[in-house]
Amino acid sequence: MGSRLSPEANAEVPREALSFHGDATGAQVHLDDQRSTARRRSTFHDGIVFSQRPVWPGERVALRVLRHEDGWCGGLRVGFTRLDPAQVAASCLPPFVCPDLEEQSPTWAALLPEGFVRAGNVVCFWVNRRGWLFAKVNAGRPLLLRKDVLVQGAPLWAVMDVYGTTKAIELLDPKANAWITSGEPMPESEVTSGEECVICFHNTANTRLMPCGHSQFCGSCAWHIFKDTARCPMCRWQIEEVAVEPSVKSGEGS
């Protein structure tokens, strides 16, 4: 099993470039010879892949969406896991990272908003020392996906699910694009209020899904999600109520 990671003690240790683990892959995954590209052969599931080594808190995992396939609902999932892929038989991997792998192991992942996973987009994601999972697309602002990743006590591997509309992805070197590693994550108050809806990228995010509390959606998109799947696209919790944020609502029309 992997050893404990200490960012303070190992900040200057050279890191091996990230690639996909060659053996622990979903049943529909095909990797190229360099293990930098993962493609889902068919259907919409069985696309789980892992990084070949543990990832440090704050380290960016960067990838490019190579191919988008219409006809499915939802796309790429990203996150982190304490599950060492070297100890996992590919035949034992479930079809989905959310919720299957999360229920079977200490794994924390989230669905990326639809606008993130268009072909050609560069996505990077990371977890900070507080256990907050962030992602951003191209040179955009960071989006807080969840706040419950356990970063102490065991290594974390990056996990991705080449799911649904996302047909193929390619891992990139974060150092090749300065914007990937630049900038600190925004405070929670800036991430979760008053921004554009992360689904339509047009209307103001003024609606909160309950009970999970994610509030990165406009009212129209939130109700569409509620009627379609009734699960939060960020954390997959069951939606029981859609609530308009009072602070945003009071400012409408002013």
Curated annotation (Swiss-Prot):
Keyword annotations of the record: Cytoplasm, Immunity, Innate immunity, Metal-binding, Transferase, Ubl conjugation pathway, Zinc, Zinc-finger
GO MF annotation list: ubiquitin protein ligase activity; zinc ion binding
Tagged with keyword Metal-binding: yes
Coiled coil, from the record: none
Subcellular location: Cytoplasm
Domain NHR positions: 17-174
GO cellular component, one term: cytoplasm
Name of the featured protein: E3 ubiquitin-protein ligase NEURL3
Species whose genome carries this gene: Rattus norvegicus
Gene: Neurl3
